[in-house]
Structure formats: structure tokens, C-alpha cells
Amino acid sequence: MPVTTIAATDVHVDAEGFLTEYDQWDEQLARALAAQIGIDLTDAHWAILRFLRNDYREQGETATLRRVSTQAGVPIKTLFTLFPGKPAKKMAYVAGLPKPHGCV
């Protein structure tokens, strides 16, 4: 796996830049990843990122938009507002998780 430096930290990433090592993620890294895609993290973002990381640890895969909406209680429209364009992909990227299945 390629290694890149983000926020002064060397991290393992896949060909698309998604982290491949769950334990390399921290909040400083999340802020840097979010900044790279033009997102300034708010409390609402952090709640979703924490849900995603906890869910990944329990389920072993990155949650879909539907799962985030139903399990975390965040309307899909809100997810599109917080992570515009491709919310599932952007949420996973910032949360330091693999790209969700079905994302292109």
C-alpha cells in the first residue's frame, strides 16, 4: 500500500487516497482530510464521523447512506448538505474508512 503524509503524519492509503489502517486515524487527520475536500468540520460532522467509526468497528464495513440515516437518525438530505456531492464517499474518506461498497 502507498504511504502519504497528511497533517505531518505518514499514513497508508489505497490508490484513491482512502486510509487503509483504521488505527492511523485521529481528529487532527480528519480535519486535514476534510480540508482537502473543502469541508470545515462542525459538531454535526463530528457526530456522523464518530457514528461511522463506531459502526465500522462493530460491523466490519463502512456504513451506507441509508444505514447512517436510519441508525444515526440523520436525514439523507442533511448528509448531502454536510458532505455535498458524494456524501457516502466523502464521509468515509474523512472518517478514515474504506470507500463504501457500491461507491464509484
Which residues fall in each region the model found?
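Pre-recognition alpha-helix immediately N-terminal to the DNA-recognition helix
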Residues: A47-F51
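Residues within well-ordered alpha-helical secondary structure of globular protein domains
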Residues: L52-N54, G85
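N-terminal first-folded block
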Residues: T4-A35
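Helix-rich interaction surfaces within compact, conserved domain-sized segments
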Residues: V13, L65-V104
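Noncatalytic partner-interaction/assembly domains of nucleic-acid and motor enzyme complexes
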Residues: F18, Q28-D43, Y56-L65, V74, ...
